[in-house]
Structure formats: C-alpha cells, structure tokens
Amino acid sequence: MGIKKTSATVFLVIILTISFSYYDVEAESVIEPAKYGACLFLCDARRDDHACFYDCTNVAIYRTGHCVGNPPRCCCIRG
C-alpha cells in the first residue's frame, strides 16, 4: 500500500509541474507584448524582425518594432 501511495504522490507532483510550466509560457505570451505599443500582425518567415522594424518606423509615432511573444507578433515601441 505504501508503494502505491508514494507512486501516486510522485505522479501527481510531475503532472502539476508540467501543467504549471504551460501556464508560464501562456503568461509570457500575454505579458511580453504588453510592454510594447500596438501589435500589428503575426511574424512568420515572410515577416521577420526587419520587416516589423520597417513597418513600425514608417508610422511617425513609433521608434522601433520587434517580433515578441508566442506566437510572435510585430509590436511597435513609441519614440
């Protein structure tokens, strides 16, 4: 009986650890873009950091732009 109880406890700790690590990833994807201004579009192979920077700096109120978050979005920073 003691072996089953210990095994169940270890199993639950592993499951909780894995589930909390997913919450951290989700929180990062929400918090990180909040540091920036407008997030215009999703970044992909065609739209990378360079394209994001170019699009943001063409608007007069933004100083720069970066692909941030998960999934990555082009977010502009006011200057």
From Swiss-Prot:
**The keyword Disulfide bond is annotated on this UniProt entry:** yes
Entry keywords, A to Z: Antimicrobial, Disulfide bond, Fungicide, Plant defense, Secreted, Signal
Secreted is among the record's keywords? yes
Query: Which one GO biological process term can you cite for this protein?
Result: defense response to fungus
GO cellular component terms? Answer: extracellular region
Q: Signal sequence span per UniProt?
A: 1-27
What subcellular locations does the record give? Secreted
Listed disulfide bonds for this chain?
Answer: C39-C76, C43-C67, C52-C74, C56-C75
Specify the superkingdom. Answer: Eukaryota
Say which family it is in. Belongs to the DEFL family.
Protein name per its UniProtKB record: Defensin-like protein 54
